[in-house]
Amino acid sequence: MASTWAIQAHMDQDEPLEVKIEEEKYTTRQDWDLRKNNTHSREVFRQYFRQFCYQETSGPREALSRLRELCHQWLRPETHTKEQILELLVLEQFLTILPEELQAWVQEQHPESGEEVVTVLEDLERELDEPGEQVSAHTGEQEMFLQETVRLRKEGEPSMSLQSMKAQPKYESPELESQQEQVLDVETGNEYGNLKQEVSEEMEPHGNTSSKFENDMSKXARCGETREPEEITEEPSACSREDKQPTCDENGVSLTENSDHTEHQRICPGEESYGCDDCGKTFSQHSHLIEHQRIHTGDRPYRCEECGKAFRGRTVLIRHKIIHTGEKPYKCNECGKAFGRWSALNQHQRLHTGEKHYHCNDCGKAFSQKAGLFHHIKIHTRDKPYQCTHCNKSFSRRSILTQHQGVHTGAKPYECNECGKAFVYNSSLVSHQEIHHKEKCYQCKECGKSFSQSGLIQHQRIHTGEKPYKCDVCEKAFIQRTSLTEHQRIHTGERPYKCDKCGKAFTQRSVLTEHQRIHTGERPYKCDECGNAFRGITSLIQHQRIHTGEKPYQCDECGKAFRQRKKTSYKEILLKNHSEPQAGVNLLLSSLIPEWQSCFRKDL
């Protein structure tokens, strides 16, 4: 009764208080406190709407009215457009389908749209080595502990029932944060255990979802409030892992033996939140706010002593230093190859598993790495942004341009560790190294040459004379499928490889490449004996026969040998078939494109 008189006395003196008391006739005190916090009220009302209980109302009409009110408070149609409301619904479903480990963390960032969620997850993958996938690599003990933390987070989320919220314990969030510290220590190891704060700062945390929800409640339910014994007995038993544990002096929160009591007191509910003046985000710790503000100011105080590159967070600098130290802590169990980043190991393991997550929308081709898809797309767009300053030739990849420039500079950066021989292109080095890796190569029993497994199969057809790929038009057979494909372009007239300089087209890419060297002046194939250089490898091989004296081509009539195979003219085709002239004509016509065939057949 005394409290009633006190309120009445203030009503005459303080008009705003009178309005507040009138409002409390229709809403709970917790509702009113939540409305004062505009930053997180939308999320609170969404949870109210989704978990509203029919039993909380006196009848169906009141229930429907209450649902409409909560939906209106959540979606705010008076201030949001239809597109914005749809985005809120899509955002809600997007957060729902995320894995539990990522879902809880993303919700702490309070994203405003689906694009912000994507940005947060991509930044997490890029900066923190895909921690969602690190979870799957934990030991059994770590996995069980992480699952327990997720379960505690779920149980720590406040019920959306208006009645049950009053009885919701106010000390679950700090315990969850203590549990999360232990999980982080398990993940990163003792060496990086002290960097928990920097790791969380790099992720720009805002505190977990339940703690944000609790901070919006009235101060009457915070640490200093005196609670009845029956409220404590209603605490879920799952939130207390042991009967006797150290507790917080302020609110009785149970702490594990390894949790930091000082850290808990600093984040205990009742402490002020720190808001960013630029974007409005709030943080439970001032250090988190300072770290976040560097995004707006561009400040990067952590600088690498080796290369001078600067970073916003200390943990990113530590990971960067691995580049200079050469440390590769992540090792593949299949082949033993080591990597400096977890994400690099994860991408590499897809080579063993055959996983290809990235698909091209134009042709359907799949890739195990995003970079592979990115470079592949340039084939369809014909984008070649990297241009050589010496010959103005353009390339789709920077790495290919770098290799090409070695033709002008004479640089051969790819050196064989076995014999020291250097090459301009990495592909040339890989082909060369097969010579040394005898244990991984397959040797031809006929001539002793070594090949890869597929290369040996094709090579053996030279000795057996097998030519399984046959042309349907002229019945000419080939050892390789690629040779048949190139040959068929003679009949179809297709010349897909066109020179950008003069417009001349060719049936083979290799012929186009060799032709383009006429314009650029490149002669990458050099003779070791006399120093003469050539545009094509075949020209170099033919030239080298001058020094070796080799003459592999022999005449069937007289037995005379030659260094080069003479090209057969159309006249010789007819002369060779003089006994059957029609057969010679048919063979000659079959080598022409269809348009020419029809023209010549009319004259015959």
Curated annotation (Swiss-Prot):
DNA repair as UniProt keyword: no
Keywords, in A-Z order: DNA-binding, Isopeptide bond, Metal-binding, Nucleus, Repeat, Transcription, Transcription regulation, Ubl conjugation, Zinc, Zinc-finger
Subcellular localization(s) per the UniProt record: Nucleus
Occurrences of domain SCAN box (ranges): 46-128
Residues annotated as transmembrane: none
Listed Pfam families: SCAN, zf-C2H2
Glycyl lysine isopeptide (Lys-Gly) (interchain with G-Cter in SUMO2) crosslink, residue number(s): 20, 25, 196
GO MF: DNA-binding transcription factor activity, RNA polymerase II-specific; RNA polymerase II cis-regulatory region sequence-specific DNA binding; zinc ion binding
Family membership noted in the UniProt record: Belongs to the krueppel C2H2-type zinc-finger protein family.
Name under which the protein is recorded: Zinc finger and SCAN domain-containing protein 12
Gene: ZSCAN12
